[in-house]
């Protein structure tokens, strides 16, 4: 098995998520390191948190706010956000982001108040 993986986001189907729609790369049983997503946020997302997952967002297009543990932070293209486990967060506005999840995204680690 190769020591690398390649993903072509133009060949990945988008799935519904609390933030809008996501294309998730490197998700599979052979990867325990991280996943990378392109997320299209079309409306205000639902506040949530993760008990195990760390997320790194990079805003590519659009603008809005990130709500992070109650703080409202304006975001524009090329803003990066590091979200630790336990941080309640949501995106507000219309934007496209890259989301890196460490360890890989697990829908069972998505918690809502």
Please describe what each predicted stretch is:
Residues 43-45, 79, 87, 95:
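Surface-exposed loop/turn positions
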Residues 70-86:
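Short acidic-glycine-tyrosine-enriched beta hairpin
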Residues 52-65, 69:
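Glycine- and acidic-residue-biased ligand/ion/polar-headgroup-sensing regions
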Residues 1-34:
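A short, N-terminal "cap"/entry segment at the start of jelly-roll beta-barrel domains
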Residues 37, 60-61, 76-77, 93:
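A cytosolic small-molecule/anion-sensing beta-strand core signal
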Residues 50-52, 93-94:
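Short glycine/proline-enriched turns and hinge-like loops at secondary-structure junctions
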Residues 35-51:
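Conserved short histidine dyad/triad with adjacent acidic residue
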């Amino acid at each position: 098995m190769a020591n690398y993986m390649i993903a072509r986001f133009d060949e990945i189907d988008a799935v519904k998520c609390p933030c809008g729609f996501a294309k998730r790369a490197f998700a599979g049983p052979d990867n325990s390191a991280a996943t990378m997503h392109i997320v299209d946020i079309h409306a205000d997302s639902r506040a949530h948190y993760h008990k195990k997952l760390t997320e790194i967002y990079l805003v590519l297009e659009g603008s809005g706010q990130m709500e992070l543990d109650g703080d409202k932070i304006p975001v524009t293209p090329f803003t990066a956000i590091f979200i630790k486990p336990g941080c309640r967060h949501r995106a507000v506005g219309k934007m496209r982001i890259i989301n890196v999840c460490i360890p890989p995204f697990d829908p069972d680690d998505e918690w809502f108040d």
